[in-house]
Swiss-Prot record:
One of its GO terms (molecular function) is pyridoxal phosphate binding. It catalyses: O-phospho-L-serine + 2-oxoglutarate = 3-phosphooxypyruvate + L-glutamate; 4-(phosphooxy)-L-threonine + 2-oxoglutarate = (R)-3-hydroxy-2-oxo-4-phosphooxybutanoate + L-glutamate. The gene is serC. Pyridoxal 5'-phosphate binds at A80, T81, W106, T157, D177, Q200, N242, T243. This is Phosphoserine aminotransferase. The keyword Amino-acid biosynthesis applies. It comes from Leptospira biflexa serovar Patoc (strain Patoc 1 / ATCC 23582 / Paris). The modification N6-(pyridoxal phosphate)lysine is found at K201. The keyword Transferase applies. SUPFAM superfamilies: PLP-dependent transferases.
Length: 365
């Protein structure tokens, strides 16, 4: 593995790169946070300095997303996978059902976890039939009668697909795993009852999950809920029911301020769409590389591509790593390549990758 004395372009799907200026700010405050004489890592979660960090981060997030007051914002410990259990526990009672769109591995895992405890849950779409290259159009007619909610994964990191527009439902609340795209574009927030996201793509370090839910649509359920999965309990305690991942919350807060300085989600969406278009255009015009995802379903966060000559794959990855392009190997179950170009990936990183791909094709095509 090569060694570098400078920052490289990190295309890993997650944990992913953070904005350099956020890292620099965290570095400057690491040993002595704003005159406290200690690091945020050492700080009690019960004292005023951390409470200020927590409150500011939530306030900034609310501003970025234009959240109505009825929506709660809660930080949960652990990864988004914990919410695969927490959501059914909070929204289903014994005998209840809900609907899932199985658009990839993570939606399938969430479905299987819910079905362990609530055997009546249903799938309304199985993307395995198209090798997860397509997404459904979901309307009220798609949703089963009696479904307590409709669950989607908004962006699929493994396959490079996403919903360009979201379902607008009256029949059932919409719940979305947005781990790999939250804060990358504007959202019609009031169309969702729950949005959750692991932090490690666009928010901050791993080990933290953000849950946003409509308090008016949180039902009373007929069973006890484990404390660290209980939405109402965690919200009542201000994300401090237990010791939270304090440093991850601090970094998330710095990221939110960075996004505000950049102009908010409208600017991020414009930038991300431009980055993705550049890369897809380069792939589509290549005679060596190709993108397997149909245009209407292509993700702006995770650009999946392959080679017509898979005998060159290992050479491409090796040379890419040597030249400072990390994390381009595709997910282990699908192979090929994947460039994750989250908010923190600068446009010049995409431009540099395109130049490298073109040079590789000239030398090996």
């Amino acid at each position: 593995m090569p060694t570098f004395t400078h920052r490289i372009y990190n295309f890993n799907a997650g944990p992913a790169m953070l904005p350099t200026e956020v890292m620099e700010e965290a570095k400057s405050e690491f040993l002595n946070f704003r005159g406290t004489g200690m690091s945020v890592m050492e700080m009690s979660h019960r004292e005023k300095h951390f409470q200020s960090i927590l409150d500011e981060s939530i306030s900034d997030l609310r501003e970025l997303l234009n959240l109505p007051s009825r929506y709660a914002v809660v930080y949960f410990p652990g990864g988004a996978t914990l919410q695969f259990s927490a959501i059914p526990f909070n929204y289903l009672s014994s005998g209840d059902s809900c609907d899932f769109a199985l658009t990839g591995v993570w939606a399938k895992k969430a479905f299987e976890e819910a079905k362990k405890f609530y055997p009546n849950v249903k799938s309304i779409f199985n993307g395995a039939d198209s090798k997860y290259m397509e997404l459904p159009t979901i309307t009220d007619e798609s949703v089963n009668d009696g479904a307590k909610y409709m669950y989607i994964t908004s962006n699929n990191t493994i396959y490079g697909t996403r919903y360009k527009t979201f379902p607008k439902l009256k029949k059932a609340p919409l719940i979305a795993d947005m781990t790999s795209e939250l804060l990358s574009r504007k959202l019609p927030i009031e169309d969702f009852s729950v949005i959750f996201a692991g932090a490690q793509k666009n928010i901050g370090p791993s080990g933290l999950t953000l849950v946003i839910y409509d308090k008016e649509k949180l039902p009373e359920v007929s069973h006890p809920i484990p404390n660290l999965m209980n939405f109402a309990l965690m919200e009542k305690n201000g994300s401090l029911y237990n010791t939270p991942p304090t440093y991850s919350i601090y970094i998330a807060g710095l990221v939110f301020k960075y996004l505000k300085r950049k102009g908010g989600l409208a600017v991020m969406e414009e930038t991300n769409e431009r980055k993705a278009k550049k890369l897809y255009d380069a792939i589509d015009s290549s005679s060596l590389f190709y993108a397997p995802v149909p245009v209407p379903f292509r993700s702006a966060m995770n650009v999946v591509f392959r080679s017509h000559n898979d005998g060159l794959d290992s050479k491409f990855l090796s040379l890419a790593e040597e030249q400072g392009f990390a994390g381009l190997k595709g997910y282990r179950e699908v192979g090929g390549f994947r460039a994750s170009i989250y908010n923190a990936m600068p446009e010049e990183g995409v431009d540099a990758l395109i130049s490298f791909m073109k040079e590789f094709e000239r030398s090996n095509g």
